[in-house]
C-alpha cells in the first residue's frame, strides 16, 4: 500500500539502492525507506542492526539475542545511506567441497547465505548455471531473494561446455551428441541461444557473461581438437566467439547495450595484455580484471589498462583459491583486499566486484570488510573497520586485543618472495594452506631423493613457470628451495 506523507516530512533519497531510517516525531512514526526493492530491504536490515542489535553475521557467529522489554529509538533518528559506490557487488561460492553437502541438511542452511549477502548490503551472486531444461536452483534462489545473477569466468550465456552433452540429451533429445569442435559453429550457437532464451524467459535479473574457455578452468585449446596452435590464431577464435555471443545476447535481451561482462582470467589476461584479444566494447560492457593468478594482486593487464577505453571496470579477487591458495584457513585479509580495490579504482571507477568466497564460513570476516569498502571507499579504512568488527562481535572490553589478534594472524603468513609490484605492496605473495599441503605432499613423495627444486608446476598449461609456489630462495637467505 502507498503511504501518503506530508511533503514537509519527506526526506529525499539518492539513487539506486539508497535508503534511510528516520523518525517523524510529530506523526510518531518510524520510516524504513528505500529507493527501490533492494534499498527497502537494506533499510529493514539497517533498522534490525541498529536498534535490534542483530549483526549481519548473526548466524555464522552463533549470536544469541538479548531480551529487550523496550526498544528506544531517538526522535532525532535519521540514518541515511547514499547509493553504493560500486554498482554490482558479488560473491562467488567456488570449490564448495564443505558447503555443498551442508546446505542439504536444512532449508535454512541452503538459504542463509542469501540473507547474509543482503544484510551486508551486497546485491549479486555468481550462480548462473542452467538445469537443462530451465534455470538452476541457484538462479531460482537469487530470484526469490531479489539478488542479481552473474556468472563464473568460464561461463558463456549462463552455461559451460561441461553442459554440452546435457543440453543435447535432455533438451534436444538426440541419441548422438554432436562433436564439440570449432567447425561445429552452428551447434555452438544453438547452445548459447538456448541459454539466452531460457534466462530471458525466467525473469531473473541477470548480468550476461561472454567467454570462450574449456569445459573447466582451462583454455579452450585444451578441449577443442581443432584448436589452432599459435597464440595469435587462438586469440582470433576468442575474438570471433565473444562477438557472436554478444550478438546473441542483444537479440534475446532486445537491448542495444545490455549489461555484459567478460573476465580476463589466466590465459585471457595474457592475451589481452598482448593486444591479441580485443573484447567487444561499449558503455555497458564490463571488462572484469583479475588478480595475478595464485597470488592476489592487480595483474599486468589492469596495470596497463587505458582508462579512456569506453567500457565499465570490474575486478575479481580470490579470498579463497583451492588448488594452491587459502582454502581451509583465511589468508588474504582486509588490508590486502583494500590495497587491491583501491589500486583498481584508481584506474577507473569500479562498477562490478566479485570475491571468490569458497565455502563461505572461513571468509566471512574479509567478505564483510569487502562489502563495507564497496559501498563507500571514502568512509572505509581496514584498521578502523577491524576494530569496529571486534566491538560488534566481541564487545568493547576486548575489542583492542581481538583487533590486534586478527591483524597479527594475517601478517604471520610466510612471504616467500620479495614484492615486485610497482610502487611496492605488503604481502604480495604469501604461502597459504594449500601451498603448504602441496609442498609437503611433493616432498613426502620423494623424501629420500634430493632436488634443488622439488616443487613442480601443477598443469601442463601453467602459463607462468614457477608461479604455483613462487619461492625465491635468495629472498630467504637460501640457495635452493
Give short role names for the model-derived ranges.
Residues 1-82:
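Contiguous, structured surface segment used for ligand recognition
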Residues 36, 121, 285, 344, ...:
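Conserved, mostly hydrophobic/aromatic
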Amino acid at each position: 500500500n502507498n503511504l501518503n506523507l506530508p511533503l514537509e516530512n519527506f526526506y529525499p533519497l539518492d539513487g539506486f539502492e539508497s535508503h534511510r531510517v528516520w523518525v517523524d516525531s510529530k506523526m510518531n512514526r518510524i520510516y524504513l525507506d528505500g529507493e527501490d526493492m533492494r534499498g527497502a530491504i537494506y533499510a529493514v536490515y539497517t533498522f534490525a542492526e541498529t536498534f535490534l542489535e542483530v549483526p549481519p553475521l548473526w548466524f555464522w557467529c552463533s549470536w544469541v539475542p538479548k531480551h529487550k522489554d523496550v526498544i528506544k529509538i531517538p526522535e532525532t533518528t535519521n540514518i541515511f545511506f547514499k547509493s553504493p559506490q560500486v554498482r554490482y557487488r558479488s560473491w562467488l561460492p567456488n570449490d564448495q567441497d564443505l558447503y555443498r553437502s551442508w546446505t542439504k541438511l536444512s532449508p535454512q542452511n541452503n538459504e542463509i547465505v542469501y540473507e547474509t549477502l543482503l544484510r551486508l548490503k551486497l546485491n549479486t551472486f555468481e550462480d548462473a548455471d542452467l538445469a537443462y531444461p530451465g534455470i538452476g536452483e541457484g538462479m531460482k534462489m537469487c530470484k526469490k531473494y531479489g539478488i542479481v545473477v552473474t556468472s563464473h569466468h568460464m561461463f558463456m550465456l549462463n552455461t559451460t561446455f561441461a553442459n554440452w552433452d546435457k543440453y543435447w540429451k535432455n533438451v534436444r533429445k538426440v541419441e548422438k551428441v554432436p562433436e564439440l569442435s570449432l567447425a561445429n559453429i552452428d551447434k555452438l550457437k544453438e547452445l548459447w541461444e538456448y541459454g539466452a532464451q531460457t534466462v530471458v524467459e525466467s525473469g531473473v535479473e541477470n548480468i550476461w557473461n561472454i567467454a570462450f574457455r574449456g569445459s573447466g578452468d582451462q583454455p579452450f585449446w585444451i578441449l577443442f581438437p581443432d584448436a589452432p596452435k599459435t597464440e595469435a590464431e587462438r586469440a582470433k577464435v576468442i575474438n570471433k566467439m565473444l562477438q557472436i555471443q554478444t550478438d546473441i545476447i542483444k537479440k534475446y535481451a532486445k537491448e542495444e547495450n545490455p549489461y555484459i561482462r567478460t573476465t580476463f582470467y589466466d590465459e585471457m589476461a595474457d592475451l589481452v595484455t598482448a593486444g591479441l584479444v580485443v573484447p567487444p566494447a561499449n558503455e555497458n560492457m564490463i571488462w572484469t580484471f583479475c588478480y595475478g593468478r595464485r597470488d592476489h594482486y592487480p595483474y599486468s593487464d589492469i596495470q596497463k589498462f587505458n582508462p579512456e577505453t569506453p567500457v565499465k571496470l570490474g575486478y575479481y579477487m580470490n579470498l579463497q583459491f583451492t588448488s594452491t591458495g587459502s582454502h581451509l584457513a583465511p589468508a588474504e585479509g582486509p588490508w590486502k583486499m583494500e590495497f587491491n580495490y583501491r589500486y583498481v579504482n584508481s584506474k577507473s571507477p569500479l562498477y562490478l566486484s566479485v570475491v571468490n568466497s569458497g565455502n563461505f564460513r572461513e571468509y566471512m570476516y574479509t567478505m564483510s570488510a569487502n562489502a563495507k569498502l564497496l559501498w563507500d571507499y571514502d568512509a572505509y579504512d581496514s584498521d578502523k573497520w577491524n576494530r569496529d568488527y571486534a566491538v560488534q562481535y566481541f564487545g568493547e572490553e576486548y575489542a583492542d586485543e581481538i583487533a590486534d589478534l586478527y591483524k597479527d594472524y594475517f601478517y604471520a603468513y610466510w612471504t616467500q618472495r620479495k614484492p615486485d609490484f610497482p610502487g611496492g605492496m605488503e604481502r604480495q605473495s604469501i604461502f597459504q594452506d594449500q601451498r603448504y599441503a602441496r609442498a609437503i605432499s611433493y616432498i613426502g613423495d620423494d623424501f629420500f631423493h634430493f632436488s634443488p627444486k622439488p616443487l613442480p608446476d601443477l598443469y601442463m598449461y601453467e602459463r607462468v613457470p614457477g608461479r604455483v609456489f613462487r619461492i625465491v630462495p635468495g629472498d630467504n637467505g637460501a640457495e635452493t628451495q
